[in-house]
A protein has these predicted regions:
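Glycine-rich phosphate-binding loops of nucleotide-dependent enzymes
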Residues: 1-177
Length: 177
């Protein structure tokens, strides 16, 4: 969709942001000073091999995340962000390093166990975050389908799924279409 063309000298950050998003964007956010808590995630000497090259996709990375912090992994495509996330979440196997979550070593924990305390928002939600043939309700319980409240004698409890989906839709102002 074409939005517009402007000369660099005739525009500013605000106008460009508004054009990119399609509505007025607030560029200044007033917020209280951060008071990060204790370290909840500690990654040390983390290496994930590349499936495409001989060189590691992620090599000897170390960092800490404190309670109250939100971490975003960003970079140019092909620089190892995806492999880092896959290694942390258990979708890929690192060749070395440790992951400590809430004081417990989860370096060899299952994906399900890691998911109890960590969340991942995929870069491409259509490719990795959703089952496009499923309904919105079904997608909302993908990671929870095994919970007793969504099961009824071996079958999906559709009413419970619908109620939970409606709860999430209201809580997070989810819009589909």
């Amino acid at each position: 969709k074409y939005i517009g063309t402007v000369n660099t000298k005739d525009t500013n950050k605000q106008e460009l942001s508004n054009m990119m998003v399609g509505r007025p964007v607030q560029l200044q956010v007033n917020k209280d000073e951060a008071h990060p808590g204790d370290v909840v995630l500690s990654v040390k000497g983390f290496t994930v091999p590349s499936h495409l090259h001989k060189k590691d996709a992620v090599h000897n990375v170390s960092f800490d995340v404190r309670a109250g912090e939100i971490v975003c992994i960003a970079g140019i495509d092909g620089n190892g962000q995806t492999e880092l996330v896959y290694g942390l979440t258990g979708l890929d196997k690192p060749s070395s390093g440790t992951i400590t979550l809430c004081g417990k070593d989860i370096s060899h924990a299952s994906i399900r166990h890691r998911g109890e305390h960590m969340s991942h928002i995929p870069e491409d939600r259509h490719k990795h975050g959703l089952v496009l043939d499923f309904t919105l309700e079904q997608n909302m319980v993908l990671q929870r389908f095994n919970e007793p409240r969504f099961e009824n004698h071996g079958f999906i409890n559709n009413k419970a799924v619908r109620d939970y989906a409606n709860y999430l839709i209201d809580k997070f102002d989810v819009r589909s279409g």
